[in-house]
Amino acid sequence: MKHLQIIILALLVPILANSQQTIEGSITHDGLERSYILYVPEKYTPGTAVPLILNFHGYTSNNLEQMFYGDFRPIADTAGFIVVHPMGTIDQLGNPHWNVGWGASTVNDVGFTAALIDSLSATYTIDAERIYSTGMSNGGFFSYRLACDLSDRIAAIASVTGTMNINQTATCNPSHPMPVMEIHGTADETVAYDGNFFFASTPTVVAWWADRNECDTPPTITAMEDTDSADGCTAEHHVYINGNSGSSVEHYKIIGGQHTWPGSAFGGVGTNQDIDASKEIWRFFSKYDIHGLINPTSISASPLSAHLNVYPNPANNFVIIDWPFVDVGEFSLHATLGTEVLKGNLVSGKNEIDCSALSPGIYFFSAGYAKQFTAVVVIQGNN
């Protein structure tokens, strides 16, 4: 991400102007001074516990670049969580890194992470049950290491273009079912989607976590709408549900995607713009604490097999949908050839959908964050 450096220099002024929210800090661990950049949203209120996201940079990158590249700050402003961007140490090749078992690194980054959580928790009101880890590339690898080696502190992880080392699963024994999201491009030339001699393939890693959490298989696979044909890639959403403690495993397969963070403002060809990785990661994290699913009655937490009442069916002028969630949902109705003919929002309770303008025929109804609710609706026409 060296190409980001010049651009980021131009963005430093807003950071300094907003210094009450963006804080540079450091702690000493194992005799090393370890730095970080902390983002605290304006809505943070001392005494009210908030989630913490650990956002780890990639190999050769740094925490400032990651703060802009895999940006969670606008989401934190509305959701209210704190996000910290730790800085790795310099390896024998002179590059910033996280110790995931590569080369001859002996840095105790797992211990540093635990100490950083302790330090931040002593200053800010952190919800100890809602601490999450994410990262780009080497930072994604490290998030998997934390899922294995610091699971008593980490509620869920998400990796972007990272994976796990070969045979790492043999010693990985999390203390609780670990919700995992993996976002990875099939054209990634840095961390190959199909793996190599040193690290496991993305499908292998995703399947291992789904099996460990005892999720339902096979996954539900949804092709995401190609909203930006100029990005040179498309996205599939693979969702494994109903794991222990309500855990799930999600994988965004970026077909034609490169070694990039989807939705990043610093994009280009091979950077998928059909999804926003940061938004999807928070949507995923927000469902879980360290004990598992927080609120099974929310839309995004509902299992894909859940039942939704859509009636009468066949219908004439109106279809009624019973929406059992507090969250506002989105629905769409498609004709048999795939054309979207109707869409809108669903509020808690009964929703009366006007179908009077539709021609008689068969339509496909879907609703929910991953289109987890589906139904075939027959429209008979006006009576």
What is each of the regions a protein language model found here?
Residues 155-245:
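The feature captures the conserved acid-bearing segment of alpha/beta-hydrolase catalytic domains
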Residues 54-58, 161, 184-185, 255:
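The conserved beta1-alpha1 loop
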Residues 248-289:
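Extracellular low-complexity, Gly/Ser/Thr-rich intrinsically disordered linkers
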Residues 23, 27-132, 145, 149, ...:
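Serine-hydrolase catalytic machinery in alpha/beta-hydrolase-like enzymes
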Residues 88, 186-189, 256-258:
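Acidic beta-to-alpha connecting loop that harbors the catalytic carboxylate
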Residues 1-21, 296-299, 339:
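Bacterial Sec-dependent N-terminal signal peptides
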Residues 18-52, 78, 130, 134-158, ...:
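A domain-start/cap signature at the N-terminus of enzymes
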Residues 300-383:
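C-terminal outer-membrane/trafficking sorting elements
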